[in-house]
């Protein structure tokens, strides 16, 4: 599971995923990429399941880049606990993904195989996605 080795603060303020991405908007490393069409918090388990879905469909020659990382911890208070008495304990790690962010990239295999792998990865994610080609205007 992806999570940071160290963080300066254990419990950050919630970061909004509304609006469009400022960076990470084009395919830089691979030939095809998976772009988010809407914003969300993508947790480490969802990133991992998408990574597994891609790597199952890629041959050993294929290369994959994961362009997002879960830097932010989400907290949760235990069940049936009264309000107040501080913030809850960290429960999971999430990546803040805004609309237009390229999340995964693939190279070194045929175009049909790349599209199939990215489609399978998109099914594992809780947001609408689209497959983009390198150099394509977004």
From Swiss-Prot:
Keyword tRNA-binding recorded: yes
Purpose: Binds 23S rRNA and is also seen to make contacts with the A and possibly P site tRNAs.
GO molecular function annotations of the record: rRNA binding; structural constituent of ribosome; tRNA binding
Family: Belongs to the universal ribosomal protein uL16 family.
Gene Ontology CC: cytosolic large ribosomal subunit
Gene Ontology biological-process annotations: translation
Listed InterPro entries: Ribosomal_uL16, Ribosomal_uL16_bact-type, Ribosomal_uL16_CS, Ribosomal_uL16_dom, Ribosomal_uL16_sf
Gene3D superfamilies: Ribosomal protein L10e/L16
Keyword Membrane tagged: no
Pfam family, one: Ribosomal_L16
Binding partners and assembly: Part of the 50S ribosomal subunit.
Protein name stated in the entry: Large ribosomal subunit protein uL16
Keywords tagged on the record: Ribonucleoprotein, Ribosomal protein, RNA-binding, rRNA-binding, tRNA-binding
Lineage top rank: taxon: Bacteria
Annotated source species: Ureaplasma urealyticum serovar 10 (strain ATCC 33699 / Western)
NCBIfam families cross-referenced by the UniProt entry: rplP_bact
């Amino acid at each position: 599971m992806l999570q940071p080795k160290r963080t300066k603060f254990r419990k950050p303020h919630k970061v909004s995923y509304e609006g469009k991405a400022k960076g990470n908007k084009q395919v830089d490393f691979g030939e095809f990429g998976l772009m988010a069409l809407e914003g969300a918090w993508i947790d480490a388990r969802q990133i991992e399941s998408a990574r597994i879905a891609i790597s199952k469909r890629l041959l050993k020659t294929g290369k994959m880049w994961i362009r997002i990382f879960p830097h932010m911890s989400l907290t949760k208070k235990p069940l049936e606990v009264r309000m107040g008495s501080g913030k809850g304990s960290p429960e999971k790690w999430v990546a803040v993904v805004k609309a237009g962010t390229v999340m995964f990239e693939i190279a070194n295999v045929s175009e049909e195989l790349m599209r199939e792998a990215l489609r399978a990865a998109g099914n594992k994610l809780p947001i609408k996605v689209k497959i983009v080609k390198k150099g394509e205007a977004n």
